[in-house]
A protein has these predicted regions:
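An acidic, gly/pro-interrupted, aromatic-rich
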Residues: 1-127
Length: 127
């Protein structure tokens, strides 16, 4: 038997995709670009002294809905949903993760368009 435990940020995203039937379980290959908050995606990124292009999620759902393990990590562009659920930063090594329960986690689960899309996919799957 497995005892209940708190999910990490990556496990939470993967679980929502799995339950909604949208998770792509393919192994290996090129990194995916999952959808992130639009306000963060449209922020200008500075690359080598110039402004880089805005972040774009993969256009095909099966590409962007791969496991979080395969998501490309851009150091200057953090995924706010995963950051809210204590994903470690890209700048330092992480021996141990923090387990903080904070109000923004509940607000993210209630108000995020990405999570709302997973809930709609689950509802459509159950019909």
């Amino acid at each position: 038997m497995f005892s209940p435990r708190r999910l990490s940020a990556e496990e939470l995203r993967d679980s929502m995709l799995f339950v909604s039937g949208e998770l792509n379980l393919s192994i290996g290959g090129i990194p995916c670009h999952p959808e992130i908050n639009d306000e963060v995606a449209m922020q200008p990124r500075h690359i080598m002294g110039s402004v880089g292009p805005a972040y774009q999620a993969d256009p095909i759902p099966s590409q962007r809905n791969r496991r979080t393990l395969y998501a490309e990590r851009i150091r200057t562009l953090a995924d706010p949903m995963l950051e809210t659920f204590n994903k470690p930063g890209p700048d330092t090594s992480c021996e141990r993760r923090e387990n903080a329960t904070i109000a923004p986690q509940a607000f993210t689960m209630l108000n995020s368009p990405i999570i709302r899309a997973r809930a709609l996919a689950l509802a459509a799957r159950l019909e």
